[in-house]
Amino acid sequence: MPIRVLDELPAVNFLREENVFVMTTSRASGQEIRPLKVLILNLMPKKIETENQFLRLLSNSPLQVDIQLLRIDARESRNTPAEHLNNFYCNFDDICDQNFDGLIVTGAPLGLVEFNDVAYWPQIRQVLEWAKDHVTSTLFVCWAVQAALNILYGIPKQTRTDKLSGVYEHHILHPHALLTRGFDDSFLAPHSRYADFPAALIRDYTDLEILAETEEGDAYLFASKDKRIAFVTGHPEYDAHTLAGEYFRDVEAGLNPEVPYNYFPKNDPQNIPRATWRSHGNLLFTNWLNYYVYQITPYDLRHMNPTLD
């Protein structure tokens, strides 16, 4: 699915160099089809890096995807130029009267911060409540999963004593589920979180269906039966080098981090890591776009009435 973005967005050239199909707005205007409108609420500090990661995963299917980037934190960014934010991001007030086919809420490095201490917690609540009536399907990633479980289901924050960092094996629980269609029986995916997601907690306190778990019994992928919300507790969007960057950052900060599990060859941080989860990440996002967004979203977005099974 070629992603449709503004011609000047830095990700255009970056992804084209990787042979990723990116369609600029000027080119897309010549195709007589309705693109899927996908809103990305980017909560990560390094916004350009995160844009590249998610746009890469949204790009590999025959339909157009019209991407809109959203920010809700008005504070000055230390990691992203103000010019970039002003040129390519909208504020919630700019889009609150619109409807979208899909919404992705990214992770955020807030695993040890209490919800009420998050500077934009009221805005997070506002967006999630708004999405119920304005978005066909929402995908939450890592910290956003924890935030959504609290806001939508009242589940208190669950925190691990140590950070889960590395590339872990998972297994699917429902081979015929649409979101896991085409998955291998077991697959690898990266995690980088303090948040804890025991599968028993999800089963006991929500009506969500767990579709894949870690080998340790943590919920990795789960969703509502009506496909309106989906959750992934890891980071399938990560580049090969992302965990390494986080590890060396923490080393320089004197935090004495554990070496990410099953990541560096021979467990040696001097060795260059490889991405062993790329096919999984691409298939997950393609399935979400197809089965959770495209197949149920209304053609006319002015009338938000998803087609439910």
From Swiss-Prot:
Residues annotated as site: Important for substrate specificity: S192
Any single GO BP term: L-methionine biosynthetic process from homoserine via O-succinyl-L-homoserine and cystathionine
InterPro entries found in the cross-reference section: Class_I_gatase-like (IPR029062), HST_MetA (IPR005697), MetA_family (IPR033752)
Gene Ontology terms: cellular component: cytoplasm
Top enzyme class: transferase
Pfam families listed in its UniProt record: HTS
Keywords: Acyltransferase, Amino-acid biosynthesis, Cytoplasm, Methionine biosynthesis, Transferase
Cited CDD domains: GATase1_HTS (cd03131)
Intracellular or extracellular location(s): Cytoplasm
Source domain of life: Bacteria
Binding residues annotated for substrate, in chain numbering: K163, S192, R249
Reactions this protein catalyses: L-homoserine + succinyl-CoA = O-succinyl-L-homoserine + CoA
Pathway in which the depicted protein is active: Amino-acid biosynthesis; L-methionine biosynthesis via de novo pathway; O-succinyl-L-homoserine from L-homoserine: step 1/1
EC numbers, comma separated: 2.3.1.46
Similarity comment: Belongs to the MetA family.
NCBIfam families xref list: metA (TIGR01001)
Task performed by this protein: Transfers a succinyl group from succinyl-CoA to L-homoserine, forming succinyl-L-homoserine.
Protein name, entry field: Homoserine O-succinyltransferase
